Amino acid sequence: MVVGTGTSLALSSLLSLLLFAGMQMYSRQLASTEWLTIQGGLLGSGLFVFSLTAFNNLENLVFGKGFQAKIFPEILLCLLLALFASGLIHRVCVTTCFIFSMVGLYYINKISSTLYQATAPVLTPAKVTGKGKKRN
């Protein structure tokens, strides 16, 4: 099921806001054990993905279709937002958020490159026929 850019902007913005609020509401519980600090980093990575989706959808609405997110400022801004939100919970959450976000960004890039990049035809060089050195 595919939704439009405006609907995706609204949904991803709402999910980003709810995830940030949930992380702040349960920050004491997320910082209580080792496994929950890793879970806090995973939630921060989800915040990164949702905020990047919202930011890119907003750019597509403003600048037109086909506008792609670049490393600076879109990805860095969303990553810093997610790392800041994770840092409000625990400092280990920042590290796990960064690791999970980089893994998620790798797979997002891999999937989007297979879907949206057109393959350029490969040009093979023509065989040069001519006189070369004569061998005796």
Swiss-Prot record:
One of its GO terms (cellular component) is endoplasmic reticulum membrane. One of its GO terms (biological process) is protein N-linked glycosylation. Keywords: Endoplasmic reticulum, Membrane, Phosphoprotein, Transmembrane, Transmembrane helix. It is a multi-pass membrane protein. The modification Phosphothreonine is found at T124. Pathway: Protein modification; protein glycosylation. Disulfide bonds: none annotated. It holds the Pfam family Keratin_assoc. A motif (Prevents secretion from ER) lies at residues 133-136. Its main location: endoplasmic reticulum. Residues 24-34, 109-136 are cytoplasmic. InterPro entries: KRTCAP2. Residues 1-5, 56-75 are lumenal. It is found in: Endoplasmic reticulum membrane. The keyword Transmembrane helix applies. The chain crosses the membrane at residues 6-23, 35-55, 76-108. Component of STT3A-containing oligosaccharyl transferase (OST-A) complex. STT3A-containing complex assembly occurs through the formation of 3 subcomplexes. Subcomplex 1 contains RPN1 and TMEM258, subcomplex 2 contains the STT3A-specific subunits STT3A, DC2/OSTC, and KCP2 as well as the core subunit OST4, and subcomplex 3 contains RPN2, DAD1, and OST48. The OST-A complex can form stable complexes with the Sec61 complex or with both the Sec61 and TRAP complexes. Interacts with PSEN1 and NCSTN; indicative for an association with the gamma-secretase complex. Subunit of STT3A-containing oligosaccharyl transferase (OST-A) complex that catalyzes the initial transfer of a defined glycan (Glc(3)Man(9)GlcNAc(2) in eukaryotes) from the lipid carrier dolichol-pyrophosphate to an asparagine residue within an Asn-X-Ser/Thr consensus motif in nascent polypeptide chains, the first step in protein N-glycosylation. N-glycosylation occurs cotranslationally and the complex associates with the Sec61 complex at the channel-forming translocon complex that mediates protein translocation across the endoplasmic reticulum (ER). Belongs to the KRTCAP2 family. This is Dolichyl-diphosphooligosaccharide--protein glycosyltransferase subunit KCP2.
